[in-house]
Each structure stands twice: as structure tokens, then as C-alpha cells.
């Protein structure tokens, strides 16, 4: 099943903590979470799907330097 995943790792290592994790399951839902000390935290699932299969979209991520 096609999906789009965005992870903001806290270090340049694959197994580092993830400050923000988002995975879009096109046509279904969006999942958001974070990983702290190797443990996934409370998962938030959004069923209001803003994306549609086959339709283009723009993804813009803005992270202020004093917030991450």
C-alpha cells in the first residue's frame, strides 16, 4: 500500500529518537507519533484524509531553529 512518511530524527542515526513521525496512508488516514528513548509514544490517527490518490499536492515543512 503506498504511503508517504516524514520523520524528524533527533540525531543522524537510524535508531535515534524521532521528535515527529508522520505517515500518510493515501485514501485512508494519517498517523502521527514520536519515539523517545526507543519507545513509541501515544499515536494520533486522523481519518480526515486531505490527500487523494493520483492528485498532486505540495508539502511544506517549516521548523524554526529555536523549536527543534
UniProtKB/Swiss-Prot annotation:
This protein's record includes keyword Nucleotide-binding: no
Principal location: cytoplasm
Protein's name according to its UniProt entry: Galectin-10
Keywords: Cytoplasm, Lectin
Organism: Mus musculus (Mouse)
Limits of the Galectin domain: 1-68
One cellular component term from this protein's GO annotations in UniProt: cytosol
Pfam families from the UniProt entry: Gal-bind_lectin
